[in-house]
């Protein structure tokens, strides 16, 4: 198949899911929601679990919505961008935010644990950045889990003995399956509200501007959508 920036696409019906009266805008966000749903299922986040989310990008923010819907408490989310942390706070007012600074992973972890007032049972790592993964390892409790959703370098260093002596599970996600029907139900029922994540919208004819906006951190874009009125 060539590109999907087109008004009409032929696709096998067997691989399509009906979204009913859901907006196409929300429908387009079912894919990142599927990423988060797979992570929720495989990481085992439960009601009352203290959770750390590393990274307040689109996946981290949707993971935040899922953790709140699942009853995780407290939830701490981290990022290097204060604007994204402010956005996370607007999305889920009860979330605790940590601005990542140029300090060691251990120092970051100490600040995060102090903010949460408890060691997280699970860390959902949504950046793939080596220092962020290491921070998550230093944060979680004995027997906790660091679940890496983000994609990082081919090779990176980890605090191996921290993982070993604290019996921390390090788990990864690269693909997902069978999530679409669940994602559709959650959005249609209002359990998960994705509407605030689209911060910029462009017509199909302005697709180049859309990509430029998405690539420029100064725009504060979370999700940029290209739409067609036809």
Where are these regions (language model features)?
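Glycine-rich phosphate/adenylate-binding loop and adjacent beta-alpha elements
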Residues: 1-16
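Mid-domain Rossmann-like dinucleotide-binding core that forms the NAD(H)/NADP(H) cofactor-binding site
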Residues: 21-103
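Glycine-rich cofactor phosphate-binding loops and adjacent beta1-alpha1 units
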Residues: 43, 68-70, 85-169, 208, ...
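Rossmann-fold dehydrogenase core element
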Residues: 145-147, 158-197
């Amino acid at each position: 198949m060539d590109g999907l920036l087109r008004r009409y696409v032929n696709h096998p019906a067997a691989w399509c899911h009906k979204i009913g009266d859901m907006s196409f805008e929300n429908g387009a966000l079912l894919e990142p929601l599927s990423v988060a749903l797979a992570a929720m299922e495989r990481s085992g986040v439960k009601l009352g679990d203290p959770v750390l989310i590393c990274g307040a990008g689109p996946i981290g923010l949707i993971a935040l919505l899922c953790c709140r819907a699942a009853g995780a408490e407290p939830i701490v989310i981290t990022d290097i961008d204060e604007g994204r942390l402010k956005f996370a706070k607007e999305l889920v007012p009860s979330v605790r935010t940590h601005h990542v600074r140029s300090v060691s992973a251990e120092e970051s972890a100490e600040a995060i644990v102090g903010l949460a007032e408890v060691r997280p049972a699970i860390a959902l790592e949504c950046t793939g950045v080596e220092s962020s993964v290491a921070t998550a390892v230093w944060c979680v409790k004995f027997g906790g889990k660091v679940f890496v959703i983000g994609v990082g370098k081919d090779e990176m260093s980890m605090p191996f003995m921290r993982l070993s002596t604290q019996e921390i599970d390090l788990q990864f996600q690269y693909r997902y399956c069978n999530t679409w029907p669940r994602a559709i139900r959650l959005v249609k029922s209002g359990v998960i509200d994705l509407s605030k994540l689209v911060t910029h919208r462009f017509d199909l004819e302005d697709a180049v501007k859309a990509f430029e906006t998405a690539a420029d951190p100064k725009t504060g874009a979370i999700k940029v959508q290209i739409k067609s009125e036809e």
